[in-house]
Every structure is written in structure tokens, then in C-alpha cells.
Amino acid sequence: MPAIEVGRIAVVIAGRRAGQKVVVADIIDKNFVLVTGAGLNKVKRRRMNVKHLEPLPERVNIERGASDEEIKKALEEAGISLE
């Protein structure tokens, strides 16, 4: 299983957004990360418990705390869809 790290694509497995893909934008502490759908799906930029995420093998090369626009551009360059 891939580790939770900045730029990692993950699937939300709990809560109202379960089943949707997100990008880890920042690591807050050992239990929480900042995730975003980068405007490509309905997941807004928010804090999420790492226990509610299932990391995928895909990863985009972004800086820690990158904006949604930067993340969206990196996803398009990598050819990764969050649908």
C-alpha cells in the first residue's frame, strides 16, 4: 500500500464524499491531511482524517500546500482524472 504523502491520489472511503478521488495537498499532522478535488469533482479543499482515505499508486509532483490551480495543472500534465 502506498504511503500518504503530498501529491498522492487517494479515494475517500468514509463520509459523504466516499468513492471520490482526491489529491493530498498538505500533511497537517499524523492523523490529518489537507485534500482537494482541485475543482474537478465536488470535493472542496478540506482537512480529512487519514483513516478515511485509501491511497492509490498514482502521484502528481506538487509542492506542499499547492493551490488548486497548480494541482489541476499537474493532474492534466500527468494525464490523471479524478472522475
From Swiss-Prot:
GO terms for biological process: ribosomal large subunit biogenesis; translation. The keyword Transcription does not apply. Keywords: Ribonucleoprotein, Ribosomal protein. InterPro entries: Rib_uL2_dom2 (IPR014722), Ribosomal_eL14 (IPR039660), Ribosomal_eL14_arc (IPR023651), Ribosomal_eL14_KOW (IPR041985), Translation_prot_SH3-like_sf (IPR008991). GO terms for molecular function: RNA binding; structural constituent of ribosome. The keyword Iron does not apply. Belongs to the eukaryotic ribosomal protein eL14 family. This is Large ribosomal subunit protein eL14.
